[in-house]
Amino acid sequence: MEVAIVAAQRTAIGSFGGGLAKIPAPELGATVIKALLEKTGVKPEDVSEVILGQVLTAGSGQNPARQALIKAGLPVTTPATTLNVVCGSGLRAVHLAAQAILAGDADIVIAGGQESMSLSPHILPGSRDGFRMGNAQLVDTMVNDGLTDAYNAYHMGITAENVAAKYGIGREEQDAFSLQSQQRAAAAQKAGKFRDEIVPVLVPQRKGDPLAFDADEFIKHDASADGLAKLRPAFKKDGTVTAGNASGINDGAAAVLLMSTQKADQLGLKPLAIIKGYALTGCEPEIMGIGPVSATRKALSKAGWTVEDLDLVEANEAFAAQALGVAKELGWGSDKVNVNGGAIALGHPIGASGCRVLVTLLHEMQRRGAKKGLATLCIGGGMGVALAVERP
C-alpha cells in the first residue's frame, strides 16, 4: 500500500498584527479543511480523522484541531489531534496521517497545521497563588513557547548565529540569500503562482461585508541590498542575523488530504503525489537549524533516492544562516530550492509552516512537471523533519 496526497491548500500568510490578526487559529484551519473537501468532493463523514499542528495553544481552548474540524462542518464523531512539534508540526502531522493509513487505522485523513502568532497571549506565572509583595512580570507565550530554546534559554536567532559561526557564513551571504528569497516570492506573486494553492479567508469588518484575504502580505516587494545592509544585528551586538535575513512572525494555515492510492482510484481522484519516504531526526539544540540535513538524508534513504535525484525542494527558511548551512551540507543548488521564495519572504506561522512548504512544493511540482520533490524544516529544540514525494 502507498499513501497519496490528493489535495493541498493553504491560506495566504498574514503579517504579525496584519490582515489575519483577529482570526483565531481554528478558524484558519477550518477554512482550509472546507476547501479540501470542496476541491475533492470527499464527504465530511468519510474523513477518518484530522491531525493539525499548532504550537501556540495557550488561550486557544481545548484541542484546537478539534475546534477546526467542528467549525469546518465535519461530524462530531470524527476525532482530531493537535500536535506540537514546534516548526515541524505541520509536516509531522502528515507523517502521522500516512502512518495511520498504512496501519489500516484510517481511510482518509486531513493533516496540516494552523497558527495565529498575533493572538498568542501573555501570561502571568505565579499569579495563581497571588503576589503578596513586589512586581510581577508577564511572559509572552509566543516568544517563550515558540521562539526560545528551552535548553539554553536563548532566542532561536542565537542558534542561527551559532550555525553562521560553525559554517563561516557571513552577513553579506545571508543578506544576498534573503534578497533572492524576496525577489523570487515577489515575482511569483505577481505572476499569480500562489493563486491555486491559496484559499481565501473571509475577514469580518466593522461595517459591510467581510473582506477576502487571499494574498501573502509579508513579501517585501521593494526589498533591496542596501536596505538589508542597513539593518542592525538582532540577537548579538556583533552578530550577522537581522530582521531582514530571518523569517517573520506570522499567521496562517495549511493542510493536505491523504488516502491510499487504492482509495484514490476508487473515488476517481488523481493524486498530486505519492509519499515515498519521511523522517523526523534530532540534532544539537544549539544548532537546530541544521536539523534538515539528517532528516533529509534519512527520508531520501527510505525513498531510495539521492539529493541529485530531486527535481524540486522546499526547505523552510527559518534564517538565511541555517538555510545556507543546510545547503552546504547537502550540496543542493539554489536553482531547485525554494524557487518561489521561502519563509524569509512569505513568513513562518510556526505550527502551519511544515505543511505550507509541502503545499507550495506540490503545486510547483504540478506546474513544472517535476517528478521527485522534498519538503523539509528545521525545528526549534534541535530536530529536523522531511518528506519525500513523487508525482505518479
UniProtKB/Swiss-Prot annotation:
Record's keyword annotation contains Acyltransferase: yes
Q: Which reaction does it catalyse?
A: 2 acetyl-CoA = acetoacetyl-CoA + CoA
Mind listing the UniProt keywords for this protein, alphabetically? Acyltransferase, Cytoplasm, PHA biosynthesis, Transferase
List locations, semicolon-separated.
Cytoplasm
Q: Name one GO molecular function term.
A: acetyl-CoA C-acetyltransferase activity
Question: Would you tell me the Gene Ontology cellular component terms?
Answer: cytoplasm
- Name the Gene Ontology biological process terms: poly(3-hydroxyalkanoate) biosynthetic process
The record's family statement is: Belongs to the thiolase-like superfamily. Thiolase family.
Question: So what does this one do?
Answer: Involved in the production of polyhydroxyalkonic acids (PHAs), composed primarily of 3-hydroxybutyric acid (3HB) and 3-hydroxyvaleric acid (3HV).
This protein's name: Acetyl-CoA acetyltransferase
The species is Chromobacterium violaceum (strain ATCC 12472 / DSM 30191 / JCM 1249 / CCUG 213 / NBRC 12614 / NCIMB 9131 / NCTC 9757 / MK)
The encoding gene is phaA
